[in-house]
Amino acid sequence: MIFSNSFIYWYIKRKFRKLNVRPGMYSQYGQDKLVFELLGNKQCGNFVDIGANDGVTFSNSLFFEEKGWSGICVEPHSTIFKNLEKRRKCKVLNACISDTNKDVTFYEVEGASHMLSGIKEFMDERHFTRIHREISENGGAVTEVKIQAITPQSLLLNHNISKVDFLSVDTEGCELSILKFFNFNEIPVACISVENGSRSPAIFKHLTSNGFHLYCCIGCDEVYLRDY
């Protein structure tokens, strides 16, 4: 089924909900609480957290780790990754998710705006403008570095993951590109929380055409469930 952009904007707006973050949960808008409930308070599940930051601040996966889930956190920013390594017990990887297992050019932001870092190839002009505006206002610097890239298939194969209960994607503008690298027919994923601050209809179109439906919008994230 083909949806117009105007319909998608209307539909996404209807799906917006607000949750209070409860003690013991770490997500910025309560995504972890919501996903845990949607998956039936599942025990011994697994997660893949792409753009995991320092592993604690606004983490969508730390709650699940503390519940005994297994998983992997992926964070490309070299400085932030050092904090991730110290703070998390799960598997961690300093890399970018891409369509290649070769090195890619990474736009690494230092300072208060470090969470805006990302793969240069996938950033649009609005994101570049935001980075330089925030550096101008808050200080910091940005450098281009080469960093290891890995495909989702290689990532999961290397860590013996055959299916994913919860996929979190928060990569500051690269979310759609990363989702397109996943072959959801080969890699079953039950639930996805993906940042979409601009409410671009492209993510909705891609995921609904790959067997998911939008459950709700919460903060800047959209939460999708697999159709079974």
Placement of each model-derived feature along the sequence:
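Phosphate/nucleotide-binding beta-alpha loop and adjacent structural elements of enzyme active sites
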Residues: 1-228
